[in-house]
């Protein structure tokens, strides 16, 4: 295939702006899908992707299209995830393209994540052109949204295609503008091989399948290849492309996009962003932009039935085959038994992994409150990395604790700015700027501690803005903070699974909330149970779960008061003894209460 006839493009859109439906229409119009395969969201292969309406893994589809100039073109659609947790995957998918189609909902306008992804695309020097989707909706205002795109992003939207993926309007015009506006790929087919892995997943029959974009050189079946970051070498067994069903080729040259299967057994060898080159004629430098993806959020996952521990480990191993950014290590807790400490890219990633474990592997799980990675400098001058409250040393050994900060940009309609500002201030935010994008939309930029975001920030942001605010964030740096460990004691015993790391100013309030919540969920015992929140030895909040009382004097009719007194004294003795040896069973709800303490 000659290079001038190839177009590599991706679709950039916010969640729910109709990206996957649009991709379906492009597949149908170019004849890639037969009638019986027209499922909605054909590219979203995981059930969870369809259900939540989000794209998690990247996909690449090769479409054949005969344009109005009578020439046959090959269009490679590279589908990207749209969520902030997966921004590294997005940047790699965009690096594989020359053009980006910015899809904006004609009734909603530009959102924060769209903006973040557009800037990623512009940084990679992509040719970005706008398309308005959902113009058939009664609330659509194409003219206003075009102005908004020009004002906020600075793209010329005067000739933007007005389309409706659902009704099939404007699909032909979109295909024509891809051919016209997206530049043909550059590259030298005779240079040493350089190919970018922009996604990889594990297939139980063929090993790891890599999606690659070839920048220089030619790749043939049977070639010996080397992965430059992991330094491993393999022999190519199959190459081909999805259109959208797999079609095998004997070779692929510079500018093309396709899949490579090389009998790789571990996903960790074929990391997203790595460069593939020939073993015997390697490229001098890898392609720029490769990063090791680091988890930002940590949480403990425990099986409800401790007999499921091995099954849970197997399930996690399987998920890790398909998701190299998910990491876990065994840990145990007195309250919950054996489980795993897991690292995730963000909250959505955490929810998805949990849901996939519950759904695909029928696991029943308890999750502990999410935390972030702190750096602790001890009095001896050592630096520790702490990702759970139980690993924090005692107060007297700590010199300072540093916590990760992020910079968050929040897009919100004018009417709700006050609520958003109040929320950011409450979460210990530092205001950077407030920018009026249009007469009605505001961009608020704050520096916030990641610790405050992982618990419930996103839900509360949606609440104060009635669902209109959109959030995008990136990691900033580590800063010293006055943080302490808050322990929850039930019956004077610390429950390790409920410990939290909080800011000292908030510790008392947080302690009170937790204790009040715990009091609701602990079943009443025969004796009084004290629930306390403590920092070190200092108790900051307390609540009592009242005792159940059996009426021991019921059998006495009249008679002497001493008889009744004797029975009551005996009961009191029994309760005292019971309290010394008694154990309080904590129900599952108590752990979940900690997660949702704000509601």
Swiss-Prot record:
GTP binds at residues 16-21, 133-136. Pfam families: EFG_C (PF00679), GTP_EFTU (PF00009), GTP_EFTU_D2 (PF03144), LepA_C (PF06421). It comes from the Bacteria. It is an enzyme of class 3 (hydrolase). Its EC number is 3.6.5.n1. Residues 4-186 form the tr-type G domain. It is a peripheral membrane protein. Keywords: Cell inner membrane, Cell membrane, GTP-binding, Hydrolase, Membrane, Nucleotide-binding, Protein biosynthesis. GO terms for biological process: positive regulation of translation. GO terms for cellular component: plasma membrane. Belongs to the TRAFAC class translation factor GTPase superfamily. Classic translation factor GTPase family. LepA subfamily. Required for accurate and efficient protein synthesis under certain stress conditions. May act as a fidelity factor of the translation reaction, by catalyzing a one-codon backward translocation of tRNAs on improperly translocated ribosomes. Back-translocation proceeds from a post-translocation (POST) complex to a pre-translocation (PRE) complex, thus giving elongation factor G a second chance to translocate the tRNAs correctly. Binds to ribosomes in a GTP-dependent manner. PANTHER family: TRANSLATION FACTOR GUF1 HOMOLOG, CHLOROPLASTIC, TRANSLATION FACTOR GUF1-RELATED. This is Elongation factor 4. The gene is lepA.
């Amino acid at each position: 295939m000659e290079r001038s006839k190839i177009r590599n493009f991706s679709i950039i859109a916010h969640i729910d702006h109709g990206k996957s439906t649009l991709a379906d229409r492009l597949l149908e119009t170019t004849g890639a899908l037969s009638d019986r395969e027209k499922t909605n969201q054909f590219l979203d292969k995981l059930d969870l992707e369809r259900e939540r309406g989000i794209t998690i893994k990247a996909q690449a589809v090769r479409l054949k299209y005969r344009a109005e100039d009578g020439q046959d073109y090959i269009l490679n659609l590279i589908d990207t995830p749209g969520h902030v947790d997966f921004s590294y995957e997005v940047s790699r998918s965009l690096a594989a393209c020359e053009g980006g189609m910015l899809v904006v909902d004609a009734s909603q306008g530009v959102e924060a994540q769209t903006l973040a992804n557009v800037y990623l695309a512009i940084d990679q020097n992509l040719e970005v052109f706008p398309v308005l989707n959902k113009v058939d909706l009664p609330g659509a205002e194409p003219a206003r949204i075009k102005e908004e795109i020009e004002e906020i992003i600075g793209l010329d939207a005067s000739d933007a295609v007005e389309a409706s993926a659902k009704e099939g309007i404007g699909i032909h015009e979109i295909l024509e503008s891809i051919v016209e506006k997206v530049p043909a790929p550059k590259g030298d087919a005779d240079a040493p091989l350089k190919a970018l892995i922009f996604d990889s997943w594990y297939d139980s029959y063929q090993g790891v399948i890599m999606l690659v974009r070839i920048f220089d050189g030619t790749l043939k079946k049977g070639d010996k290849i080397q992965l430059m970051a992991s330094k491993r070498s393999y022999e190519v067994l199959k190459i081909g492309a999805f259109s959208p069903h797999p079609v095998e080729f004997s070779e692929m040259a510079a500018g093309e996009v396709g899949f490579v299967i090389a009998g790789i057994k571990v996903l960790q060898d074929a990391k997203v962003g790595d460069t593939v080159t020939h073993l015997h004629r390697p490229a001098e430098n890898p392609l720029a932009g490769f990063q090791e993806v680091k988890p930002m959020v940590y949480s403990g996952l425990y099986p409800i039935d401790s007999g499921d521990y091995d099954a849970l480990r197997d399930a996690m191993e399987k998920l890790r085959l398909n998701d190299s950014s998910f990491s876990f290590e065994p840990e145990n807790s007195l309250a919950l038994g054996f489980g795993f400490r897991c690292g995730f890219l963000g909250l959505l990633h955490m929810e998805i992994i949990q849901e996939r474990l519950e759904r695909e592997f029928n696991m029943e799980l308890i999750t502990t409150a999410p935390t972030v990675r702190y750096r602790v400098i001890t009095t001896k001058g050592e630096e520790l990395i702490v990702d759970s409250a139980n690993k924090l040393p005692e107060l007297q050994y700590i010199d300072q604790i540093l916590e990760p900060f992020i910079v968050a940009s929040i897009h919100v309609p004018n009417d709700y700015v006050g609520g958003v500002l109040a929320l950011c201030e409450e979460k210990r935010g530092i205001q950077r700027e407030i920018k009026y994008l249009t007469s009605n939309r505001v961009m608020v930029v704050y520096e916030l501690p990641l610790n405050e975001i992982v618990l419930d920030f996103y839900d509360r942001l949606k609440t104060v803005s009635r669902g209109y605010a959109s959030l995008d964030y990136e990691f900033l740096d580590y800063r010293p903070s006055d943080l302490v460990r808050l322990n929850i004691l039930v019956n004077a015993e610390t429950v390790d699974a409920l410990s939290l790391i909080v800011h000292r100013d908030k510790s008392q309030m947080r302690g009170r909330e937790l204790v009040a919540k715990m009091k609701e969920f602990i079943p009443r015992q025969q004796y009084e149970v004290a629930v306390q929140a403590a920092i070190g030895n200092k108790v900051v909040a307390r609540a009592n779960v009242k005792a159940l009382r059996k009426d021991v004097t019921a059998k006495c009719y009249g008679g002497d008061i001493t008889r009744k007194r004797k029975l009551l004294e005996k009961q009191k003795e029994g309760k005292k003894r019971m309290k010394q040896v008694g154990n309080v069973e904590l129900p599952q709800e108590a752990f979940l209460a900690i997660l949702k303490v704000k509601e």
